Design a protein with these regions (language model features):
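Active-site PLP attachment segment
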Residues: 65-103, 126-131
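PLP-dependent aminotransferase class I/II
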Residues: 3-15, 19-23, 28, 32-34, ...
Length: 172
């Protein structure tokens, strides 16, 4: 279906998509190998939306680390929260430096404020970053708790017809 959509866009517009953005809803991994193979075939970068998939894995590899970029969210309803904000995973220093430069207002290295490009103010506060770093140390505990709650639901609802609990693809 993905490849069909790419070819359809190319036929209709003469252009390939600028990016492929797979989304890990409810911690459920997408098929990273298939998506990356198709993306590589057409030279399209992958930006993984792992906001709901933090800590989830596909064949042992953490979501957000397959594509050119991975995006995490630290909103209040996520596995780890800083009350807002997020993180960007970059595969190389050049991309990381470019993103940081734009996220910190694209200010040029002069003693006065000079901007040769439009930048943004997307920095997380030091306090929020500290909260996030502290919570990273207990990410595995949060994941284990969620799996425990899932197993409770499975046990309590197993005899009710029509109810199916989704399992992580990596789970047996």
């Amino acid at each position: 279906l993905l490849e069909k959509a790419i070819l359809d866009r190319k036929e209709k517009t003469g252009k390939y998509p600028k990016a492929i953005i797979p989304v890990a809803l409810y911690g459920m991994p997408y098929d990273c190998e298939k998506i990356m193979a198709i993306a590589d075939k057409y030279g399209i970068p992958v930006i993984e939306d792992a906001a709901e998939g933090m800590g989830s894995r596909f064949n042992g590899q953490v979501l957000g680390t397959f594509g050119r970029f991975g995006v995490l969210s630290f909103n209040g309803n996520k596995m780890i929260t800083t009350s807002g904000g997020g993180a960007l995973i970059c595969r190389n220093d050049e991309d990381a430096n470019n993103v940081m430069w734009h996220a910190t207002q694209a200010r040029d290295a002069y003693p006065y404020y000079q901007h040769t490009e439009i930048g943004y103010n997307y920095r997380m506060s030091n306090v929020c970053a500290g909260i996030g770093r502290g919570q990273m140390t207990v990410l595995d505990d949060h994941i284990a708790h969620h799996k425990h709650v899932q197993s409770l639901y499975e046990e309590l609802l197993k005899d009710i017809p029509g109810i199916h609990i989704h399992k992580q693809p990596a789970d047996p």
